[in-house]
């Protein structure tokens, strides 16, 4: 790489991929390749004396993404098994980022009080730093969040989103999903989520089926029309799986994790594919990631919706 032009990101990434010579970057290592890719991206922006997000945009930035705040976590807690992984609040009518953060903080703090009143016990913090779900019933959880929103006076400014992570609730032997104390088929799960979208205001629902349940995603995308169906585990930032999802009309968009796809160039290519094929990408960090993650610059620079 010595002597290469830092402004030529594609050439740098291509060089590393060719030096590695494997399909999944096992020779040089995915972490090493990705770290160098990001470092070169930052260096190129710095040499132009521009913030990275501005360098990525290459022009006027018209808007910033709607922030998503994970306020309630599913999984097992105190004998309660909540199937859906993350209940998300989106202050989609906030006037700016500062107000969106203020709304989210107030709603989160109020939600702790609402949960305490519901259970009679101190709420616990979950693995993703939201409150632990106090009920197996997703509707109870959504109603409690809605009460917190209403109590704070933000009823007209907030919507929901869900990261269901239903791969974790899938029984591969019987081809059923755990939901609210029962095992259900993908048809029943799709019908249930459809009812939720008719009762509550959702921006998106992520990973509502198993990572290989292509038929289920196609059904969901066809049947559920009041919100966006997006994928993370289904697509894993993989170009072949993203293309298959597009061809099957299985999703509206997908989670794009740059260090999962491997290089900045490959991440930009995945985003470009989405933009050119009527889908959208949502950049995302990984658990345990750093505060200054490049995904923030990508989200703003690429004009990601949320």
Where on the chain are the PLM-derived regions?
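Metal- or metallocofactor-binding catalytic centers and their adjacent structured scaffolds
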Residues: 1-48, 101, 130
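Generic secondary-structure signature for well-ordered alpha-helical cores
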Residues: 2-6, 17-21, 45-46, 50, ...
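Beta-strand segments within the central parallel beta-sheet cores of soluble alpha/beta enzyme folds
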Residues: 11-14, 51-70, 159-164, 204, ...
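Predominant activation on well-ordered alpha-helical scaffold segments within soluble catalytic domains
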Residues: 13, 17, 34-45, 53, ...
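Short glycine-rich or small-residue beta-strand-to-loop segments that form or flank ligand, phosphate
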Residues: 23-27, 88-90, 130-132, 253-257, ...
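Glycine-rich anion-binding loops of enzyme active sites
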Residues: 31, 59-87, 131-159, 168
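Mobile "lid/hinge" segments at catalytic clefts and subdomain interfaces of large enzymes
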Residues: 62-124, 129
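Catalytic core of soluble alpha/beta enzymes
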Residues: 121-122, 136-306
């Amino acid at each position: 790489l010595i002597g290469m032009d830092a402004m030529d990101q594609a050439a740098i990434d291509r060089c590393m991929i060719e030096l590695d010579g494997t399909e999944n970057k096992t020779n040089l290592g995915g972490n090493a390749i990705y770290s160098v890719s990001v470092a070169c991206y930052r260096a190129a922006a710095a040499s132009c004396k521009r913030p990275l997000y501005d360098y990525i945009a290459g022009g006027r930035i018209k808007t910033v993404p709607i922030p998503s705040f994970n306020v309630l976590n599913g999984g097992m807690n105190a004998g309660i098994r909540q199937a859906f992984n993350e209940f998300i609040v989106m202050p989609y009518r906030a006037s700016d980022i500062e107000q969106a953060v203020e709304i989210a903080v107030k709603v989160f703090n109020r939600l702790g009080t609402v949960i305490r009143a519901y259970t009679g016990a101190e709420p616990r913090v979950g693995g993703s730093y939201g409150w632990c779900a106090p009920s197996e019933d997703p509707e109870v959880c959504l109603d409690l969040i809605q009460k917190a929103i209403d109590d704070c006076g933000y009823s007209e400014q907030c919507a929901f989103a869900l990261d269901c992570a239903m791969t974790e609730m899938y029984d591969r032997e019987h081809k059923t999903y755990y939901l609210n104390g029962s095992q259900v088929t993908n048809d029943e799960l799709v019908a249930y989520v459809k009812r939720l979208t008719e009762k509550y205001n959702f921006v998106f629902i992520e990973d509502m089926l198993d990572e290989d349940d292509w038929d289920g995603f196609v059904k969901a995308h066809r049947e559920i029309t009041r919100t966006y169906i997006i994928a993370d585990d289904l697509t894993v930032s993989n170009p072949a799986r993203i293309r298959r999802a597009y061809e099957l009309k299985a999703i509206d968009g997908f989670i794009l994790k740059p260090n999962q796809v491997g290089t900045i160039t490959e991440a930009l290519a995945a985003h470009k594919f989405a933009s050119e094929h009527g889908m959208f990408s949502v950049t995302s960090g990984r658990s345990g990631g750093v505060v200054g993650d490049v995904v923030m610059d990508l989200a703003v620079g690429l004009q990601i919706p949320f």
